């Protein structure tokens, strides 16, 4: 089931990754503002980090105004000498669609506080649409890289657990061989002790008592060895089952990791 959900997410993300920016409206302090917007198939926190990294890589420091992420003096169009303060609103699409985020970009006149009068004209809004489109690759690239990091961490964790199980398997096999050897030697010692008891004189009560005491000890050891062997063999059987399960989990997780890497490569 997890595999199919993961594949469905890849297909769904692929569809959304082709989405273009669009004109929308954003309500702030009971006023509706025209904004450029784009929808991306990633959680809000990841998208927020992606926007920050994108803008920082271009030399723009982040600021905050109310719920807006603000970057000052941003040239939204390379062919326009003007620059605007870029007000970003980054929110999840809905409570039922937490892995889809809407990025809204509102261009505000440089250095002015957000009010209806400070909003740039319609040409800046067109530039804002293009600016969001230019960010699409970075949004998807950054988000997929974060997924790859998380998935790689999961794969490494599974590999670590598999290594522990493998080492445990070796230790258990070694203990089983050791106790099988002890049990085989114990059997020989009991046979030898039986012969010694049979050859002893009936009148040698002291010698017989010691011989029987030694035999009792050998039989107690036999019981102990057999119990430990049963336990270790049961542990080894469980270990083998766990290793099979972990191998299956690893194969699935590693396939998901490779799928993510392919998605990243396909973006380029």
Regions found by a protein language model. Give the residues of each.
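Bacterial Sec-dependent N-terminal signal peptides
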Residues: 1-25
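Sec-dependent signal peptide cleavage junction
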Residues: 17-37, 44, 129, 133-134, ...
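Extended alpha-helical coiled-coil "stalk/arm" regions
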Residues: 161-222
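Structured segments of extracytoplasmic/periplasmic soluble domains
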Residues: 50-61, 134-138, 142, 182, ...
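Long, charged amphipathic alpha-helices with heptad-repeat/coiled-coil character
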Residues: 169, 215, 221-250, 257
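Soluble oligomerization/assembly scaffold segments of membrane-associated complexes
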Residues: 91-177
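Soluble non-cytosolic domains of exported or imported proteins
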Residues: 41-45, 122, 142, 251
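N-terminal, leucine/charged-rich tether regions that mediate assembly and partner docking
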Residues: 19-115
